[in-house]
Amino acid sequence: MDYYQWRKKNRRRKRNLQTKKPLNYALKLLKYRVRFEDELRERLKKQGFADEEVESTINTLKKQGYLDDEKAAYLFALDEMRLKLFGPRVVRMKLKSLGVDEEIIERAIEKALEEIDFHEELKRLKGRFKDRWELRDYLYRRGFDPSLIEEILNKIDGGEE
């Protein structure tokens, strides 16, 4: 074995040792996107780390501010509502399926609803539908409450006249 093969082999071994640490693996996962506590716990256990190591890693990340379910839920709700145009009902179901606490879900959705202006988004969307009923059905399927749909449609119709 020559020097270059030996160096390559040792570099690979060193890289494997570094990624075997649960904190390094968790930081690697958090580098790509914000994750929820349960989601990260599941991924670490799936990777084969012991329960004590997983809990210690999660506590460390919480203390350092890298892991915050409230912030993650808010960002998730904001993205789903603004980019994918999902309503609160669908976002609530998705967050529940990710294992987020009920109180955190409600606060995140309220905060996201305050920040998003659906009227501008839906004005552009209205041109795709023949009539008001089609748009209403579309919004209901996307998870909007009937009262919110009526409010939005009345504002859109009132703004055009």
Curated annotation (Swiss-Prot):
Keywords: Cytoplasm. It is found in: Cytoplasm. Its main location: cytoplasm. It holds the Pfam family RecX_HTH1. GO terms for biological process: regulation of DNA repair. InterPro entries: RecX_HTH_1st, RecX_HTH_2nd, Regulatory_RecX, WH-like_DNA-bd_sf. GO terms for cellular component: cytoplasm. Belongs to the RecX family. Modulates RecA activity. This is Regulatory protein RecX. The gene is recX.
